[in-house]
Amino acid sequence: MCLSVSLNFHRVKDNKPIALVAKQSILVYKVLEVRGKHYYTPYMSKAVNFDDEYGMFFYKTTRFSIDRAYFGGQYHYGVLRGVHSYFDFDKANDSSDFLNKIFDVLNIHYAIIPKGSKFYIGSNCDIASSNLVVFENEAKYNENKEYFGDEPIEFSEYYKKFGTELDSK
């Protein structure tokens, strides 16, 4: 999956969009492929093994990979490396409906972008983040979300509260 960076949310500096920093944990949705009793990321087929006790899986990406292309009279930026998810459940569902034509079975999982993580907002209600915690199911999310120090909020609430403050602290 490649995220097309929405320049409505990001400034560009030195030919790269500037990542935002989560000021509060953000609730997002991760689409995973199911093969038997195992989970994988679509496209990259990275195995996702949930912790037996807490039902969580931690992603950590140390650096984003940004690609720049010029077409249609302007530059477009894509995030190739980063942890991809959706901030809108309906868009995640639309994506899984489309991807089900390619992959056998897909599930949508609750996930959290932890406070302090860097992230890019895409043009299709998608997000690429430097960190992501994916939960096996909604019950595991509800049981364990408190361990992240603050209450995760939906992106729409996050945007109302913080906008796109470009604060890297």
What are these regions (language model features)?
Residues M1-V83, F89-K169:
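Conserved NAD+-utilizing ADP-ribose enzyme module
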